[in-house]
Amino acid sequence: MTKLRTEDLTRILRAYPRAGSTELCARLNGINRATLTRALKTLGDAVIVRGESRRTRYALRRPLRGNAAPIALYRIDEHGQGREIGQLSFTFPEGAALSFEETFPWPLDGGMADGWFDGLPYVVNDMRPQGFLGRNFAHARALDLGVSDNPDEWSDDDVAHVLATTGYDQPGDLILGEAAYRRFLDYVRIGADRFLAESEVETSYLQSAENAMRHGDAGSSAGGEFPKFTASRLVNGRKVDVITKFSGVDDSPAVRRWSDLLVCEHLASLTLPRMLHVSSADSAIHRYGGRTFLEVVRFDRHGDFGRSPVCTLSSLNAALIGTGGGAWPKTARMLQAAGWLSDTDAAKVALIWWFGRLIANTDMHDGNLAFRPGLALAPAYDMLPMAYAPMRGGELPNREFSPDPPLPADAPTWRQAAEASVYFWNICAEDTRISAEFRRICDDNARKMAALLARMQ
């Protein structure tokens, strides 16, 4: 094949990614398949091939920051042992291709089954730094990594670069890139003694909170989000990794309310399994140095270094459904109809969502619901009455609690969730770790909810 024809093939592959041989031959002025095959061989590793037989497609390899080599994808198992499970490559003009070294445990729709993705593979995208911890990381490392200090502005290429360079401790069980995996090995080498004894927790937590506020987003609570840090603990002899949220240190009305909400989140995590038989993340409340700390056990971490897979509804929805958020039960029904979500877990999603509605949780975005492979519902988390969170500037909202009655089809689920919400509001009203003012609100809400439930029986 002439040099010009090679350039023509490169041009067509750039313009028409994931084209099959029939399409490529047609776009190259009707050349035959033998000529195409020779041309593809000439381009060598510059061409990515995925799929078998009639599903075979071709794309032109795109470098990531000047490096066109595939990036290894590793998995860490529950015992802390790692292995390579695939290789990630980037394609022109955008998107990625993933080779699978073993069975992929997450749903794959359409071309994803052959390894083609419009952006990053959704389980990799789910690892991206975000929220308070992500912003703290970006503020600290943006200059070194050549990315914006706002992770919301990162492109897929930025995310891949950051993960492949530094992402050894992201949510779930995956690590992207050899450099990040070597960081994990360093972590294993020096991190076995990281677990805090009970006697060390107070000092460590107070220092971690101070560090988070000094180096992080000091306006987080004002913006409707708890500041937080990660830690490793010995709890009754058990090694656990935790995410710890904390309140401010003064006695202002806004800080008291944030403290109240942390206790409410802990009580909601107790209510879900007790009243609805829905698993929730283990949690505990601590009071140190004028701050309230909510310690939430990570369900994707096990023992010294073990990990397990997890993916949020946000990434699953974007990749498989594309509804862009909305009510969890609606998205769950769509996953159920596609055969990815069981009837049992779809029903549990509806229960969790209605419970959230009836405890005034106005922050049930798709990032606050997660799944394990299968898709099996992961323990619930971030469930609290966010309608009562202080507004930006610290003013407390004066909101009337007006719970929604259900449509007939939702009535059985609603009643179960309503009974659980009455229980929740009552235990909040009785918990002296919550301020007297907010306990009165909780008591009033329990009465309103009980009255509505009685009318709906």
Please report, for each region that a protein language model flagged, where it lies by residue.
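Phosphate/dinucleotide-binding and metal-coordinating scaffold of catalytic cores
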Residues: 1-8, 14-23, 27-457
